[in-house]
Amino acid sequence: MQNKYPLLSQIDSPEDLRLLGKEDLSALANELRTYLLDSVSQTSGHLASGLGVVELTVALHYVYQTPFDQLIWDVGHQAYPHKILTGRRDQMHTIRQKNGIHPFPWREESPYDVLSVGHSSTSISAGLGIAVAAQKENAGRKTVCVIGDGAITAGMAFEAMNHAGALHTDMLVILNDNEMSISENVGALNNHLARIFSGSLYTSMRDGSKKVLDKVPTIKNFMKKSEEHMKGVIFSPDSTLFEELGFNYIGPIDGHNIEELVKTLTNMRELKGPQFLHVRTKKGKGYEPAENDPISYHGVPRFDPASGKLPQSKIVPTYSDIFGNWLCEMAENDEKIIGITPAMREGSGMVEFSKRFPTQYFDVAIAEQHAVTFAAGLAIAGYKPVVAIYSTFLQRAYDQLIHDIAIQNLPVIFAIDRAGVVGADGQTHQGAFDLSFMRCIPNMTIMCPADENEMHQMLYTAYKMQTPTAIRYPRGNARGIALQPMAELAVGKARIIHQGKKVAILNFGALLSEAQEVAISHNYTLVDMRFVKPLDKTLISELADSHSLLVTLEENAIQGGAGSAVNEYLQQIGKIKPLVLIGLPDMFIPQSTQQESYADFGLDAKGIDQKIKLALS
């Protein structure tokens, strides 16, 4: 390693980094970028975001005394270079793997990971809390939050900045802007002006003038507005927004000019009050395929970096593909069907729909709360909104789900992707709770397809209904079953897959094939329940009468899930039967492959069989 990475091989912590001369930092950044590409191409993971913040990461750890100074990364996709520089370089081959290092900053993993993350737009709120605590204790530590131009569009980020501006707390927010959406004013002049506005002379004059003008409020307000206007003209019109929130805006500066980054950050480290640094970067920087197609190279499987070709592994369509195709099929005949996504177009299978039906497609950015209530408004106006959202992100709009959809009994369809175990992204991304938090909401109909054909029929059934509906389906490839013509399902009715004896397995969702292997092997009854709400109560009652053991199977937390619903009903009708609930345990599910998680928690055929045998013994 020393031959290929002579500088990086010496860096076991930021303390080692800070021993380097400034003249070595560019060479280190080049080595870090190459190492990141070599590492991720062998393991899979998030690539383009990390490539874009290499210089910024080096500069931050060079200027700030981490971990004494607190560095917080929003979301965490871009934190791979941070992990490499903070003692985890030689563990990068384990990232996103079972018992390996976490794909996002994780507090239990390193003192350099101040905040555990995975969802977006949380950094400034947490950073403000950390900064306030440091100020109360006179700790002298600095707080820095790095947030992307996607994450900063979320309401939570602006709520935090509004509060920070009011408190006038010492903290730095860095906007990592890797799009052209905010500003294009990047260049030598802007870098020079950023150094002036962050420098000690300008800052001293600014702060001294404020103290004098505090006694003359009218003139002080005029000067403040003049400064905001000047920055808006020189830097970016967007600077006015952040200045109005109470931040001192600097930028935009070139996020790949490490010399300018170090100079500007060194100046800003000494500034008081809320500071905002706008840094322009290029996602995928330094690797041409990722620069040209940052979306495809955002998260990558293992690939050959020399060719830059990503493997085409999909023979069977994914459940997301099935959803996207259904949406296009429906939109061909109904201009009132509307597709909504909170910044997950590619992941939710909506690319084709967005291109073919642009007037019926809305990407509301990272704004799950808004997405749900926006759908409510469309439904009130007579449209048929379909909200495509990951299970883990629907959690962020729970009040809107209840207050704006369910109470008004509006016909909004929720296509809940990544329900159940998602694999390598770990605790923050598992779809473990949606059945539990939706099942208690009145007016909701909840469906769990066992395969893509059933999913197809359920989506159509939801389309025909005039009440809120949710269809939850897993990450990954479907089963390869041919789709039948669309037809409505009988709401709340299950279907018996195999009629057996003694044991009845009530399956909710896509684990049906695992359950079927066990049922056929032992001649157990197997039921595809289809609906979590309403349950097929008649069938459950009959099965309780005719079988000595009932088993529920679901890819959701056992607490409050589908099995709990069956148990509650049996208690209600006084049929106290032996009942085995198989699902996800009371813990946050760590990273691994989906198959490893199924085996670990007894959700594969072997585990199901063992749990039933234990109950029968």
UniProtKB/Swiss-Prot annotation:
Statement: the UniProt record of this protein carries the keyword Magnesium: yes
Stored InterPro entries: Dxylulose-5-P_synthase, THDP-binding, Transketo_C/PFOR_II, Transketolase-like_Pyr-bd, Transketolase_BS, Transketolase_C, Transketolase_CS
GO molecular function, one term: thiamine pyrophosphate binding
Entry binding sites for Mg(2+): D149, N178
Pathway: Metabolic intermediate biosynthesis; 1-deoxy-D-xylulose 5-phosphate biosynthesis; 1-deoxy-D-xylulose 5-phosphate from D-glyceraldehyde 3-phosphate and pyruvate: step 1/1
PROSITE patterns per record: TRANSKETOLASE_1, TRANSKETOLASE_2
Name of the protein in its database record: 1-deoxy-D-xylulose-5-phosphate synthase
Cofactor: Mg(2+); thiamine diphosphate
